């Protein structure tokens, strides 16, 4: 009798645990922004966190600390041809993108190390740090969005979230 009771309790606990796990809100979805620019195929893979009622700039994304520029794994940029991003040369292949937030001006960090979790930043692997142009948005962006906007033999890489848009021009070499 006690074995049947124990088995029933284990079964009920298991069902309740599964229901609780399934009821949790989804984490940050992952996205790939893609474009063909000047004969180069360019993509940015990143996690897209939501605001979920939180203050983002200066709080969830603190000023003065390197940020993974997304959620979960580090954000990566892959290009089939070399690029000039904000004056820095980025070779064909894959690099990791971090940002250094500041109230006045942000930096885009282009890092040679790839495949790491977003918080595993190694400054010794930096390829370059370039200035980002910061613009206030009139309407908030609820979910982090990265876009590649082609223009001639180059374009603009844009990062938008909350009421902030960051951008940097690039050209295909």
Regions found by a protein language model. Give the residues of each.
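Targeting-peptide/extracellular-domain and disordered-appendage signature
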Residues: 2, 19-91, 96-173
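Bacterial N-terminal signal peptides
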Residues: 7-16
């Amino acid at each position: 009798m006690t074995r049947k009771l124990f088995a029933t309790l284990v079964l009920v606990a298991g069902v309740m645990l599964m229901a609780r796990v399934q009821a949790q809100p989804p984490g940050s979805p992952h996205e790939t922004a893609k474009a063909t620019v000047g004969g180069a195929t360019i993509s940015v893979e990143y996690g897209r966190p939501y605001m979920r009622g939180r203050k983002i700039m200066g709080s969830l994304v603190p000023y003065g600390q390197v940020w993974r520029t997304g959620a979960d794994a580090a954000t990566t940029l892959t290009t089939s041809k070399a690029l000039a991003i904000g004056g820095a040369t980025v070779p064909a292949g894959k690099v990791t993108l971090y940002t250094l937030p500041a109230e006045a001006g942000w930096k885009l960090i282009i890092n040679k190390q790839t495949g790491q979790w977003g918080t595993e930043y190694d400054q010794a692997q930096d390829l370059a740090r370039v200035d980002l142009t910061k613009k206030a948005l009139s309407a908030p962006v609820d979910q982090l969005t990265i876009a590649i906007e082609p223009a001639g033999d180059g374009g603009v890489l844009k990062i938008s979230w909350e009421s902030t848009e960051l951008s940097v021009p690039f050209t295909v070499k």
